[in-house]
Amino acid sequence: MIKALTLMAPLALLAACGPSNDARYLISAAPGEKVANLRSRTIEVRLVSLPSYAAASEIVAEGDGGALFALGGAQWADDPARGMTAALARGLNQRTGAAAAVEPWPLNTGPDVRLDVRVDQAYARADGVFALTGQFAVSSPEGTVREFVRPFDILVPVNGTGPSAAADALSRALAELARQVSQAM
């Protein structure tokens, strides 16, 4: 009996030290309507630049007094920068019909345009609105299209509370960003 307890004690300690089983939420872009007359057939989407709180794996929301707090027991299922970049590429592909891919560009022939997105804010505000703000730049390595930089200030309602509502709001905000980029190109 003592021998069995001696063997089980280290196993119990290892189980207690195991990783937590936090809920993980996917980053996606809601589907949207197609944009006609896009001059670019190929789009390289560079890794989205995020502020440190938005690049962390924890999902954050604004609390009383304006401070940002991690929503307990909830994390993004993917690295937020990579997840937002992939969602934006999927959204652009669906909206434009252009071949949109995350950097590095996977084909031998270079892309018609490169999209660089820099996010200033990405969080669920205390007033029930999700804010996604920053700027995007479209560059043309071969000079085939006009290059430009545009700000974006996207506000979408957060329907409900908690991390799933914040994840849904981010999805809709990314879909709106894909729409704005598509129309600008």
Per-region residue spans from a language model:
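Sec-dependent bacterial lipoprotein signal peptides
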Residues: 1-17
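A structural "domain/chain start" motif
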Residues: 17-80
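Surface-exposed short loop/turn segments
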Residues: 18-36, 90, 95-142, 159-160
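Soluble periplasmic/extracytoplasmic beta-strand elements of cell-envelope proteins
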Residues: 42-48, 60, 114-118, 131-137, ...
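Short secondary-structure boundary motifs at beta->alpha junctions and helix caps
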Residues: 67-77, 142-183
